[in-house]
Amino acid sequence: MASNLTFEDKIGILDPKGLRPNPLNNEPYSDDYKKLAMVWSTYPAYSAADRVLSALENYQLVFVTSSTGSGKSVLIPKLALHYTNYNGRVVMTLPKRIITLSAAIFSAKVSDVKLGESIGYAYKGSDKSMYNDQNKIIYVTDGIFVMEYVRDPLLSKFNVVIIDEAHERRIQIDLILLFLRTLLQSGNRPDLKVIIMSATIDTDKYQKYFNSVDSTVIDIAGQPNHPIETHFMDKPVTSYMKEGLELIEDLIHQQIKKDMLFFITTSNEALQLCRSIRPQYPRVYCVEVYSDMDKNLKQYAESRDKYLELGNYDQKLVMATNVAESSLTIDGLVYVIDSGYELSSRFDPECYGQILEKKFVSKAQALQRRGRVGRTEPGVCYHLLTKQQFDGLADYPTPDILRQDITMDLIKIIQVSPNKTYAEGINMMNQLMDPPLRSHINATRNLFDLYNVVDDNGILTQVGIVATQFSSLPLNRILFLIYAFELQCAREASIIVAMTEFLNGRVTNLFYKSDTICESNCEKQAANLLLEKLIQKRGDHFTYLKIYQEFSKSTDQKSWARKYGVRLDTINNIERTANQYFYRILNLLRKPRLPNNKNTLIDTSIDTPMDIQSRISSTDTKTNLLNALKKSHQHLTASKLKPTYSKENITGKISRDSVLNQIYKKNEISKKKIIYDELSNINGKWEFRTVTIIS
């Protein structure tokens, strides 16, 4: 590679007036590019271009701190590409799918190229054509990047790696930090540049973690473009929903007609609030923002004026979960109301369940929420906390590694350890910025023994090796695919796994939630009609399969989806994901298996085309699927509503979202033996989600 470009080379990102050809395609810049450049060239991140390029020239590791609205998520990757003479490849990780897609779309506009060419993206279930060899900058979720590292620990595809929103401390981010530290300290990629970015980050702690790597810190102007007026409560509020709604109504009555954002904890809260607002204030466009929301609805939330196409509105009101805290940009906001809460989950290793609870956000999160305004004009932030409560918030969120199940994360680490052993995996786990709890490690070891994930020498078995190729799934779903392959029902199992993943315990997630986007007959009655028609007496897993099969055999799938209010984008993503799982499990298990595994897999080394076809679908599919579910969910089994693998004496109930409630009375269900995909504690009560009766 020739000498790297500097701030003096006014091409590409450093050519906002578009005076020279675009180095990505050697074509003249469009007028749209020049108009947009008048905006992004004023961002604080652009003003720091010379410092960023100089840091990349002189250091292998660069920390960038900056508040939201600085433009770092879009401009820093372009500066990194500029540093490589537009010949290298830059990858940037982001924590959420919706944010990854938004960043890629805006980045393509800023680069004046078609999305999927020089600018690409990848997340679980995304269009595979968007991530290709033509990409110069790729936006990926943390999980996708972890898989890249597992496949190629040298990260040989990339010249610059950028980690955004590092302060969130998700398990995937902690793994990435460990992997990057291991790679940088090894000296095997002296040419690789790494940038770690965050709005709020403890740079001393991070630099200490990378203590043997030469690094520097760049602080990009932390102040908003415009002043933000901040308000706190005089006394603690008893209901942030009630207090927030009253504040919103007061602002509406003042006839200011400026856009507002209210941070709440769940999509259901967002829907509830918008349903309260719409009838009373028909000139206020209320829109819900949450993870995996409908992409059409999302554009009306993000754009400053696009919602005006939908009706005679004066202002926009956004009800959002914490997905709107960071990289997701909502244009035109003047008011932000922060409830001060988020919905948090933590793993209970005694019963392999999740405890869901509302808790205060960290100060870092609260400041990010405040930073949603003050970008294009002066803003106002209302924290529904007293000043004393605000000052008492934890500085940063608790790392997920201390709160979540680490089963699949340990499998990934074993896979990239030098000799791929359990002992080495544990040793690497203890090198994380915050090592996991011993109780979580013990719970994981118990599952490894139960399902023969590692052998007597601590080496990954065939089961463990296959699991590394599905590491974004929980272990029970991976095992279900493996056992379904053995029992000749892999295609149906792939559909069930994809449906379970996307619906997240609620079959209602397949249907439109909001009445602002439905094309036609999206009433709740239509959804109920479909469920009544297709519901399966075994429960959720088989009902999911039946719904998909009904969709698949329809001659006009779009009309079918519209008729029942089904989200076509969701079921199309399910179909694409199911196909990926199906062909991946076929390709993995058609290879010769490792010898002497106790959890014997079919030896497919001499399979004929007829054998493979028979394994795709058998005559007794339902029985085989049920047996595969039993084998893969041994630790997620309950008898008389008591988890059988739990060390705690607990009793749960079937989630109200399960279709079983529409078939059986409570006293009938309580006598059954079930398997479930998730055990959750909500408001102190345990419930089973995504449930199938096995006897």
Curated annotation (Swiss-Prot):
<dbReference type="GO" id="GO:0003723">
    <property type="term" value="F:RNA binding"/>
</dbReference>
<keyword id="KW-0946">Virion</keyword>
<protein>
    <recommendedName>
        <fullName>Putative ATP-dependent RNA helicase L540</fullName>
        <ecNumber>3.6.4.13</ecNumber>
    </recommendedName>
</protein>
<dbReference type="InterPro" id="IPR014001">
    <property type="entry name" value="Helicase_ATP-bd"/>
</dbReference>
<dbReference type="InterPro" id="IPR001650">
    <property type="entry name" value="Helicase_C-like"/>
</dbReference>
<keyword id="KW-0067">ATP-binding</keyword>
<keyword id="KW-0347">Helicase</keyword>
<feature type="short sequence motif" description="DEAH box">
    <location>
        <begin position="164"/>
        <end position="167"/>
    </location>
</feature>
<dbReference type="InterPro" id="IPR027417">
    <property type="entry name" value="P-loop_NTPase"/>
</dbReference>
<keyword id="KW-0378">Hydrolase</keyword>
<comment type="similarity">
    <text>Belongs to the DEAD box helicase family. DEAH subfamily.</text>
</comment>
<dbReference type="GO" id="GO:0044423">
    <property type="term" value="C:virion component"/>
</dbReference>
<feature type="domain" description="Helicase C-terminal">
    <location>
        <begin position="247"/>
        <end position="434"/>
    </location>
</feature>
<keyword id="KW-0547">Nucleotide-binding</keyword>
<dbReference type="GO" id="GO:0005524">
    <property type="term" value="F:ATP binding"/>
</dbReference>
<dbReference type="Pfam" id="PF00270">
    <property type="entry name" value="DEAD"/>
</dbReference>
<dbReference type="InterPro" id="IPR011545">
    <property type="entry name" value="DEAD/DEAH_box_helicase_dom"/>
</dbReference>
<feature type="domain" description="Helicase ATP-binding">
    <location>
        <begin position="53"/>
        <end position="219"/>
    </location>
</feature>
<feature type="binding site">
    <location>
        <begin position="66"/>
        <end position="73"/>
    </location>
    <ligand>
        <name>ATP</name>
    </ligand>
</feature>
<dbReference type="GO" id="GO:0003724">
    <property type="term" value="F:RNA helicase activity"/>
</dbReference>
<dbReference type="GO" id="GO:0016887">
    <property type="term" value="F:ATP hydrolysis activity"/>
</dbReference>
<dbReference type="Pfam" id="PF00271">
    <property type="entry name" value="Helicase_C"/>
</dbReference>
